[in-house]
Design a protein with these regions (language model features):
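Hydrophobic alpha-helical transmembrane segments
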Residues: 5, 9-13, 59-63, 91-96, ...
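Helix-coil boundary and interhelical linker segments in multi-pass alpha-helical membrane proteins
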Residues: 1-11, 73-93, 124-130, 163-175
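N-terminal signal-anchor transmembrane alpha helix
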Residues: 4-31
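Multi-pass membrane catalytic core of lipid/isoprenoid biosynthesis enzymes
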Residues: 51-77
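Short, non-helical or kinked segments that cap or interrupt transmembrane helices
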Residues: 35-45, 107-120, 147-155
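Interfacial segments of multi-pass membrane proteins
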Residues: 50-55, 76-80, 97, 101, ...
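Cytosolic, membrane-interface loops and tails of multi-pass inner-membrane proteins
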Residues: 25-58, 192-206
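Transmembrane alpha-helical segments that form the membrane-embedded catalytic/substrate-channel core
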Residues: 17-26, 95-106, 181-190
Length: 206
C-alpha cells in the first residue's frame, strides 16, 4: 500500500519538476543574456526560440522536449505496470503532470510553454499508431499552411480522438484529451491571429 501511494506521489512531483525543465529559457538566459519569454511571441518553446535565435540551439530544445515527455512517461508507465496498474494509465497520469510542469514550471516562476512536443511524445508512448497519425497530420498541415500553431493543435486533437478509436485505457485517453484541450486554450492568441490571417509562418529551411 505504501509503494502504491508512493508511486502516485512520486510520478506527480517528478513529472511536474522534470516537465518544468525548459532549455529555451535556460539557453536564452545563459547564451543570449535575455529571457525568451520577453522576445518574439513570448512563448518559451522550440518555435519561438528558432524564430528569434535561429537553428544553432533550437534543435537541442526540440529533442529535449520530446525526450522529456517520452522517457519519463515510458519509465513511469512501466513502473505502474510492475505494480499491477495499467501501463497507459500510469504513462498518461505522469504525462499530465509533465504537461502542468512544462506550462507552469516551479523553476521559472510558473511561466512556461504550451507543451506541444511534450504531448506529441507522450502520445507515441500511449499508442504509437496514434502518435504516427498525429505526426503525419502535423507534417501535412505544416507543409500546406506553414502555420505551426494550426498544425500542432489539429494534429494532437486527431491524436486524442485516435486513442479512443484504438481502445486506449479510458481514464488515460480522457486525461490526454484534457491536456490537449488545455494546450489549445493556451494557443488562444495564435487562434485570434489565425482568424485574422496574421499568425507567424514556420519555414523549415529558414
Amino acid at each position: 500500500a505504501v509503494m502504491v501511494i508512493a508511486i502516485w506521489l512520486i510520478a506527480a512531483v517528478l513529472g511536474w519538476y522534470i516537465g518544468g525543465m525548459n532549455l529555451a529559457i535556460s539557453i536564452s538566459k545563459t547564451v543570449y543574456h535575455e529571457d525568451i519569454r520577453t522576445v518574439g511571441s513570448g512563448n518559451p518553446g522550440f518555435t519561438n526560440f528558432r524564430r528569434v535565435y535561429g537553428d544553432k540551439y533550437a534543435w537541442f530544445i526540440f529533442i529535449f522536449d520530446l525526450l522529456k515527455g517520452a522517457v519519463v512517461c515510458l519509465l513511469f508507465g512501466l513502473w505502474f505496470r510492475y505494480l499491477g496498474f495499467d501501463f497507459q494509465l500510469g504513462a498518461a497520469y505522469t504525462g499530465l503532470f509533465i504537461m502542468l510542469g512544462h506550462s507552469f514550471p516551479v523553476q521559472f516562476s510558473f511561466k512556461g510553454g504550451k507543451g506541444f512536443l511534450v504531448l506529441l511524445s507522450e502520445l507515441f508512448v500511449l499508442d504509437w499508431h496514434a502518435g504516427l497519425i498525429a505526426f503525419i497530420v502535423m507534417t501535412m498541415l505544416l507543409l500546406t499552411t506553414k502555420y505551426m500553431s494550426l498544425s500542432t493543435m489539429c494534429a494532437l486533437t486527431v491524436g486524442a480522438v485516435c486513442l479512443f478509436i484504438f481502445r486506449c485505457n479510458i481514464p488515460a485517453a480522457v486525461s490526454y484529451a484534457v491536456c490537449v484541450l488545455f494546450m489549445v486554450v493556451r494557443h488562444k492568441e495564435n487562434i485570434k491571429r489565425l482568424v485574422k490571417g496574421t499568425d507567424n509562418e514556420f519555414h523549415l529551411g529558414s
